[in-house]
């Protein structure tokens, strides 16, 4: 275990300990393979992107986030927001037509936003192809890496100029408040070529004017311990997600099981080259003639109320409780027990 005080530094202020946040950001940047990182207190990644202030009036933000579109309805005033229906190069290129931009810091700027795993059906975009196409279009590719996390995907290596990640899972669901890490790509390419997109993103982040985040020692301790145990915990999340996906895929009481590790997933081939150590902690499926609310009522309460990123399997309803879609985030609990509880609830619904 790394020593928190020696790694991050601290000073005593009014009886409590305030952390040297810059050292903590440097530790995250090293883990993410980033040139620089910033920590932001925000409820989710789009909110953090807004708070950073790097997407400016006059910019165009093209985003694939069909399960989180409302997050882009606020915080991007005077920006041209375009939501696309799929995370393909063709969709992003079409939405970018007629917008004349460059990588000059003054702007305006063109932003492309995707999740490494996200959207309905848990899509996995081809980040390599998107990264190349973004640079050709003079766009800055931003990746929300929350679901896959830094353990399961390396967006900056694959071509993103900026990677943002909500730290719920990194902190094992124990963070006192919601935090997001924003990481900018290194600008040095092969053969001493400079990556203009990364240089632009770095300049924007440097000049954003956002004050350094205040973290208490307790908050920093949770994040430091989370980083120290991240690989072991995330491998457990990923392995349990695979087991639960295989159980659900064979279950006649549900349909349309989406998990990038299943050969039936439309992005399975892409995912094998984009994701690492497995295929993420999430599984999505649809109920047959029942609503998400019906299933939640038949399950123990902790399945729906446990902390995001924690050790207990957690279910949500991305289309609302009246919809039939369920998203399961595997914990580190016994997948056989989780499958048994799910099976009992599904069979109960089938008899009603």
Give the residues covered by each predicted segment:
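Conserved PLP-enzyme active-site core in the AAT-like
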Residues: 4-7, 12-18, 23, 27-250
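Conserved residues at beta->alpha junctions
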Residues: 42, 329-332
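Short intrinsically disordered coil segments
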Residues: 195-199, 300, 345
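Conserved C-terminal alpha-helix-loop-beta "cap" of PLP-dependent enzymes
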Residues: 253-330, 337-344
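Generic C-terminal helix-cap and adjacent flexible tail
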Residues: 344-352
